[in-house]
């Protein structure tokens, strides 16, 4: 099950479209979805989460809490819409393109991909590109 919660005025234009894509990605990685909760919020909401649970005091675009077991993905993904807007301007990307990348990045973390080392970053970036390509070419939706 995939749930979407909104702590901001923003709402996804088509939750079904995103859910179908996420299910596709997860199945391609030979995993299953138990429960994924996407919480869209603002910077203040997310920095409070960052402070409270991670003891960090800076803005970020996404925080993922992983409760997955074996092949069953279970997690909460908090996404700052304001940070996505900021980063889309900074990186000269369309807002929804940046949002899709952040969403799939978080899902890949739940699947088990890491991005601490350069080789891990490279692999994760390539996976993001592949799954964004599938979405863009409408192989998924």
Curated annotation (Swiss-Prot):
Record's keyword terms, sorted: Cytoplasm, Endonuclease, Hydrolase, Metal-binding, Nuclease, Ribosome biogenesis, rRNA processing, Zinc
A GO cellular component annotation in the UniProt record: cytoplasm
Required cofactor names: Zn(2+)
Residues engaged in binding Zn(2+): 105, 109, 115
The keyword rRNA processing appears for this protein: yes
Domain of life of the native organism: Bacteria
Cystine pairs: none
Alphabetized PROSITE patterns for the sequence: UPF0054 (PS01306)
GO molecular function terms attached to this record: metalloendopeptidase activity; RNA endonuclease activity; zinc ion binding
Coiled coil feature spans: none
Enzyme kind, highest EC tier: hydrolase
Cofactor binding note from Swiss-Prot or TrEMBL: Binds 1 zinc ion.
Family: Belongs to the endoribonuclease YbeY family.
Protein name: Endoribonuclease YbeY
Organism: Karelsulcia muelleri (strain GWSS) (Sulcia muelleri)
Lineage: Bacteria, Pseudomonadati, Bacteroidota, Flavobacteriia, Flavobacteriales
């Amino acid at each position: 099950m995939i749930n979407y919660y909104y702590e901001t005025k923003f709402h996804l234009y088509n939750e079904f479209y995103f859910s179908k894509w996420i299910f596709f990605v997860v199945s391609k990685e030979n995993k299953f979805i138990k429960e994924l909760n996407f919480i869209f919020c603002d910077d203040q909401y997310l920095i409070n989460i960052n402070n409270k649970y991670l003891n960090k005091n800076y803005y970020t675009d996404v925080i993922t809490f992983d409760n997955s077991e074996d092949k069953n993905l279970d997690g909460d993904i908090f996404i700052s819409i304001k940070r996505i807007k900021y980063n889309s301007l900074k990186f000269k990307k369309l807002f929804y393109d940046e949002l899709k990348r952040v969403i799939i990045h978080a899902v890949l973390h739940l699947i088990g991909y890491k991005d601490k080392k350069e080789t891990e970053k490279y692999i994760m970036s390539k996976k993001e590109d592949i799954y964004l390509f599938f979405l863009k070419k409408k192989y998924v939706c």
